[in-house]
Amino acid sequence: PDGTTTTLGREGSDYSAAVVANILDAESMSVWKDVDGVLNADPKIFPDAEQIAELNYLDTIELAYSGAQIIHPKTIKPLQNKNIPLYVRPFGDKRKPGTVIRGMSAPVVVPILILKKDQVLLTIRSRDFSFVLEEKFATIFSLLERFRIKTNLIHNSAVNLSLCVDNSWHIDEAIEALREAGFDVMKAENMELLTVRGYTDELWRKYA
């Protein structure tokens, strides 16, 4: 607003291309990356990462939400609206097919692993030991929203709510606001969150 220059953020160029593809009713869209396509894990962390040949739009959005960095979920929506396939290809070797993302695809046959570092585990409990139900959920998440704290995992019991959240400059302010609202809060820092889709016993033995 008011002539202020801004950007679309991470992967903004991909999103811009997706909007143009939507407007032009393109047959497909290609993005060029420094990897062979969409992989089932970050090869810098998991050396045995494998390429995924096909994904559907919803799986791609879920992976992006879980922390996969290759495609931003904003990029998918304009393509999904008109069922435009997205090809993720390596700029180092244009002959490789990469990964295709579209409305219908074959099931993913390899497990998908996403590791998010620098996480904070918050354990929240009402001081009167009352159940953590809808009203308290609303209070907790409205406070987290106020301080722009992104929640990546939720686990609740009768009196406790455990949240794995991204670390943030405002995390301590959010905790103080929760305490002022009548909650006890415990914080564990320097945590990691491993998300696994397609869990197997072999993966448990390897990474537990």
Which stretches of residues belong to each language-model region?
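C-terminal catalytic "cap/lid" subdomain
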Residues: P1-A208
